[in-house]
Structure formats: C-alpha cells, structure tokens
From Swiss-Prot:
Keywords: Cytoplasm, Phosphoprotein, Receptor. Coiled coil: none annotated. Residues 203-213, 342-352, 585-601 have a biased composition (Basic and acidic residues). Its main location: cytoplasm. Induction: Expression is up-regulated by androgen, but not by glucocorticoids. This is Specifically androgen-regulated gene protein. It comes from Homo sapiens. Residues 1-41, 56-538, 551-601 are annotated as: Disordered. The keyword Ligase does not apply. PANTHER family: SPECIFICALLY ANDROGEN-REGULATED GENE PROTEIN. Residues 415-429 have a biased composition (Pro residues). The gene is SARG. The modification Phosphoserine is found at S131, S133, S519.
Length: 601
C-alpha cells in the first residue's frame, strides 16, 4: 500500500502519515481555515473519475436495496457508509476552522471498503497534536470527536449530491481546545434537520443495533466512546477483508448514530433514511420493531396428511386416535372430522354398490367387541364434554366406529330390538356431537318398527340396514347384488338358506348366521361379474346338481343347444362367447378346469 505524508496548512499542525487503503490511489488533503464549497477542486482527474464510478455503483446498489434484491448482510451495512463517505469540505457547526476532507483514491471495491471505512478513522492522534489533520488508523482515543466530525460531514453533504464515495475517508479532528463541545452541537444541529427524513418500510429497518444506538445517542461525550471502541480494527485493510456480519452490524450502529443527514444524495435517499430511522425514533421501544421481522415460520402439515396416516390406526385403536386429535388445533380437527365423514360416506356408498355389508373387511373387530367399542366412547365423551370444540370432531368418528358394532348387536336380536336400541342411546347422549354429526344414528336406532321405511330412502344407511334386518327390502338388495355373481352356483340355495336363516337371527346364534351372510358377499367381491352377462332371471332355474351334471356330460353339442334353448338365441355351438355355464363349449371349460386343478376325473 502506498503511503503519503500529509502536511496540513494550519498553525501548530504536525504532519501525520496516513496509509492509503486502495491499491493504486493516494489520498490528498487540503486543509483551509475558510469555509469553501469547491470540495473537489484539488482532486486529480483520475480521482474524479473514480468518484463518478463509485457514485454510479452505489446508486445501483441503492436501487437494488430498494427493490429488496441485495443480500441482508452486505447491503444494509454498506449503504450507510456510502453516505458517510461523502464529507469533503465540512464547515464545523461551531464556526471554528474549517476541516477539509478528501476521499481516498477510488477503486471499484465499493462494498467492502465502505463497510470498512468508518470505524477506523479515530481522532486520537490529531486531538493530541492539537491539529485538525488526518490521523492514522489507530485505536479510537476519543470517539466524541469522531462523532462530531462525521456529523459535520453529514451537514455538508447536500452540497455534493453526486459524490457517493464509500471509501475510508480522512476526517479531520478539530483543535484540542474544543473536544468536549464537539459532540453536542453537531448532534443538535443535525437533529433539527431530522424531520426531513423519510422512514423506510418496517421490513427494511435494522432491528438489532437499535438498542445500542438509542443508548449511545442521548448520552454525554464521556459515554459516547463506547460504541466506536467496539469496532477498532488495527487497520482499514483488515476491516475491508473481513466484512463479517458482526462488524457490519456494529458499523451500522455507529454510522446511524452519528449520521443524521437531512438531504442525502437523491440516489441514496431511501438507504440513508433507513440508516437514520433508528436515531429518529430513539424514544420508541426497540422491541416494537422486532415483531414484523419474524417472517419465516416452519410450515405445518396440512390436516389431510394427518388424516391419511391415522385412518388405519383409528379403527384398531380409537383411544390413540382421539389422543392424537385432541392435540390438534380446533380448526384443523374440524377439517379432519369433515373429511373423515366424507371418506366414510364414500366408503359406504362404494360398499353398497358392490353389494357388501359395511365394514365387512373387519368383522372380527366389531363382532368381538360390540359393546366395548361403545363404552370407551361414553367415557371419552364425558371427558371431552368440557371442551365441546374438541368433542365435535372426535365424536363423529367414534360414533361412526361404534355404529357398525351397535348395528351388529341389533342384527343379532331384531325381535327385542327396542331394548338394545335404547341401550346405546343413553350412552351416546353425553356427547352432543355424536347424534348431531353422525347422521346414521337416528335411523339405525329404531330398527324394528321402521325397518321397511328406513331401508330404501337414505342411501348412506342402506349398507348398515343390510346387516341389521331381514325384511323384503333386504332380500331385494341382496337379489340385486346377486346379479354380480359370475355363475349361478348356489344362488337359489343361497336365497333359500337366507330364508331359513331369518328365524335364526333372533337367537344367540346370530353371529354365526351373520358370518354365513357375509361369505357370499366375499365371493362376489373377489369375483366381479360383467354387467352384460344378464340379470338374475337367467340364473333362477339353475340348480347345483344340474350344473354338476352338465359339467360331466360328454356331448358339448347337447349342452350348447340346451343353453341356446334356455337363452332363446339360435347360435351355432362354438360361436358363443358368453362367460357363463350356458354358452361355453364344454371342452374348453374342462381344459381350463383341469389346468386349474379343479376338475377331477
């Protein structure tokens, strides 16, 4: 780095060596005792070009910061220094000898140098020597003079709107006769001008350093030494090479405390205002501005994910499901209960269309515990009664879980139906959400008297009533679903056994008969039959023995003609493509059965 000796023109001044922080440029200082606004007259053309270049760079950085594009660490820390680098010829508010400051040689290293610039210009040396010449980059001896000279710089800034130069600038220290008055008068003069500043939006304010600023701004000269001493690097190069977050924040503190520029250059106005917003509102509570900046919250999982994960475990462990749901927020649990009801409804309808009784896939669970699934619900409802918000979402799920169980208990005893029906009723009454939210309850309870009327109108409950009564409506439903059978095997015998089973359902053997009922539907579920294969009438006359005889007959011709006579379609024997025992050629069928190992000869 080049060194240059600066010989100020003041009386009693002694030369001070200043280390330039730029690679190829050296700083020159002209110190005068009269106030002069021709601040750049003494600069060389190279230096002026550098200043113009830096001005453009900082202008672009400022516009970037206004649009929120620049990074948080570098930009807020550097922009205040950009303004602070402006001082060139500064009249002191005290009317003492003027201090002229020149910027150091400029290079495009704007961001880091600007962040490195302001703390290392302490005035200790100049103060002791009694001159207002440039000090070395040494530790800060008296920071009040530092603050004073920076405020003087800011007071003269409007004169040079185009010179944004964030390099380490040389600040002159006033004579040692006025070290104490310095901080007070510039601050007063600058605070008068603060009204012009436009506060930045809250998202751009610096929150952390405010407390330090507010503490240091109103204090007297003795206290003001604290903030600058936080940032005393050994040299400005060191500061440039380490523009870390902590340094930039501390730099921000000192700059915005000392700086109250009334009319900064146009390009930098929002940035300057941001830097000074904290000193302006030093009376405010610094914590009040911390709130808007807490933006990034961890995203919660949407409620349907919880629902999908808990659906399988709910049937097996309702208590666990309930405890998990009570932790959820009431809004989320409301959504969950709604979507859970929708899922159940869709499941019911799908089971109806397949002709299956509801919850047939888990008969063991509900059959083994027809009452135990209701009793825990009662206790749970009583626990939840103080919190109806939580009881509402949880109750529908429990109710719908217990309904199949209650229905099966009722199906086993339709004759004394009013007794069991009134049994579950008082148990479910403690939770108001049960009856209200689960619409199947009012219909499933009065089974015996209203069986015929309740069977057909409500669609969601028809799957439920299938299990619970043996009225003609039930046989209609079963007969309709029988058309889904692949073959007519055992159809009429199934209907006859159903008739025989109807008296059994009122006895204690209800569970066995119920399982007997389920097994054909399991067959139907595993072997779906195309709808184009005809209606139940086609299979009405088929008997099990007759079908076995047909299988064992040798003449496929006679079989096919039999099928044709029954089907009333005069087709040649081998053209039929029906997937039924009537039209299939016997040889193909026997071959297939042999391959499957189902036909023994």
């Amino acid at each position: 780095m080049p060194e240059r000796e600066l010989w100020p023109a003041g009386t009693g001044s002694e030369p001070v060596t200043r280390v330039g922080s730029c690679d190829s440029m050296m700083s020159s200082t002209s110190t005068r005792s009269g106030s002069s606004d021709s601040s750049y007259d003494f600069l060389s053309t190279e230096e002026k070009e550098c200043l113009l270049f830096l001005e453009e760079t900082i202008g672009s950085l400022d516009t970037e910061a206004d649009s929120g594009l620049s990074t948080d660490e570098s930009e807020p820390a550097t922009t205040p220094r950009g303004f602070r680098a402006l001082p060139i010829t500064q009249p002191t508010p005290r009317g003492g000898p003027e201090e002229t400051i020149t910027q150091q040689g400029r290079t495009p290293r704007t961001v880091t140098e600007s962040s490195s610039s302001h703390p290392p210009e302490p005035q200790g040396l100049g103060l002791r020597s009694g001159s207002y010449s440039l000090p070395r980059n040494i530790h800060i001896a008296r920071s009040q003079n530092f603050r004073k000279s920076t405020t003087q710089a800011s007071s003269h800034n409007p004169g040079e709107p185009g010179r944004l130069a964030p390099e380490p600038e040389k600040e002159q220290v006033s004579q040692s006769s006025q070290p104490r008055q310095a901080p007070a008068s510039p601050q007063e003069a600058a605070l008068d001008l603060d009204v012009v500043l436009i506060p930045p939006p809250e998202a751009f304010r610096d929150t952390q350093p405010e407390q330090c600023r507010e503490a240091s701004l109103p204090e007297g000269p003795g206290q003001q030494g604290h903030t600058p001493q936080l940032h005393t690097p050994s040299s400005s190069q060191e500061r440039e090479q380490t523009p870390s977050e902590a340094m930039s924040q501390k730099a921000k503190e000192t700059v915005s405390t000392r700086y109250t520029q009334p009319q900064p250059p146009p390009a930098g106005l929002p940035q300057n205002a941001r830097a000074e917003d904290a000193p302006l509102s030093s009376g405010e509570d610094p914590n009040s501005r911390l709130a808007p900046l807490t933006t990034p919250k961890p995203r919660k999982l949407p409620p349907n994910i919880v629902l999908k994960s808990s659906r399988s475990s709910f049937h097996s462990d309702p208590q666990h499901w309930l405890s998990r749901h009570t932790e959820a927020a009431p809004g989320d649990s409301g959504l969950i209960s709604c979507s859970l009801q929708e899922q159940r409804k869709a499941r019911k309808e799908a089971l109806e269309k397949l002709g299956l009784p509801q919850d047939q896939d888990e008969p063991g669970l509900h059959l083994s515990k027809p009452t135990s699934s209701i009793r825990p619900k009662e206790t749970r409802a009583q626990h939840l009664s103080p919190a109806p918000g939580l009881a509402q979402p949880a109750a529908p799920a429990q109710a719908s879980a217990a309904i199949p169980a209650a229905g099966k208990a009722l199906a086993q005893a339709p004759a004394p139906a009013p007794g069991p029906a009134q049994g579950p009723l008082p148990m479910k009454s403690p939770a108001p959400g049960n009856v209200a939210a689960s619409k199947s309850m009012p219909i499933s309870i009065p089974k015996a008297p209203r069986a015929n009327s309740a069977l057909t109108p409500p669609k969601p409950e028809s799957g439920l009533t299938l299990q619970e009564s043996n009225t003609p409506g039930l046989r209609q439903m079963n007969f309709k679903s029988n058309t889904l059978e692949r073959s007519g095997v055992g159809l009429s015998s199934y209907l006859s056994t159903e008739k025989d089973a109807s008296p059994k359902t009122s006895t204690s053997l209800g569970k066995g008969s119920f399982l007997d009922k389920i097994s054909p539907s399991v067959l139907r579920n595993s072997r779906p039959r195309p709808a184009s294969l005809g209606t139940g009438k086609d299979f009405a006359g088929i008997q099990v023995g007759k079908l076995a005889d047909l299988e064992q007959e040798q003449s496929s011709k006679r079989l096919s003609y039999q099928g044709q006579s029954r089907d009333k379609l005069p087709r040649p024997p081998c053209v039929s493509v029906k997937i039924s025992p009537k039209g299939v050629p016997n040889e193909h069928r026997r071959e297939a059965l042999k391959k499957l190992g189902l036909l023994k000869e």
